Amino acid sequence: MFLGTHPVRLDDKNRFVLPAKFRGMLDSVVLTRGQERCLYLFDRSEFERISDGIRNTALSQKKVRDYLRIFLSGAAAQLPDRQHRIVIANHLRAYADLKKEVTVIGAGKHIEIWDSEAWSSYLEEQEAAFSEIAEEVIPGLI
């Protein structure tokens, strides 16, 4: 399970070093558009499981087709290099409006990559409603 918050920097080639805690958990990865203008980084097998699940839904529904197009068309598969660096394609960097300072967060079965300022703003907005949200999405679990 991917956990934690890790500040990293993008180099001049749009690469970042994968946090040490995540290195042994990933071999081949897929980077794609995420929600709230962040990027999602999946282990390739998890990405295939999710994309298979989406493809197995009713493709006759326009919303399913639209989501599938956006999710898959931006995806980029790769292997981290020997220095554990991941390259962010230009179109994905633009989508998430990533600058030099980025934040890598563990989000359970995937990793999210945020512009650091955007992550700070998002966290500030969401923390205020955190306990209220818990009662709605996970009633009685915590």
Swiss-Prot record:
This is Transcriptional regulator MraZ. InterPro entries: MraZ (IPR003444), MraZ_C (IPR035644), MraZ_dom (IPR020603), MraZ_N (IPR035642), MraZ_sf (IPR038619), SpoVT-AbrB_dom (IPR007159), SpoVT-AbrB_sf (IPR037914). Residues 5-46, 75-118 form the SpoVT-AbrB domain. It comes from the Bacteria. Gene3D superfamilies: Transcriptional regulator MraZ domain. Pfam families: MraZ (PF02381). It is found in: Cytoplasm, Nucleoid. GO terms for cellular component: cytoplasm; nucleoid. Belongs to the MraZ family. One of its GO terms (molecular function) is DNA-binding transcription factor activity. Forms oligomers. The gene is mraZ. The keyword DNA-binding applies. CDD domains: MraZ_C, MraZ_N. Keywords: Cytoplasm, DNA-binding, Repeat, Transcription, Transcription regulation. GO terms for biological process: negative regulation of DNA-templated transcription initiation.
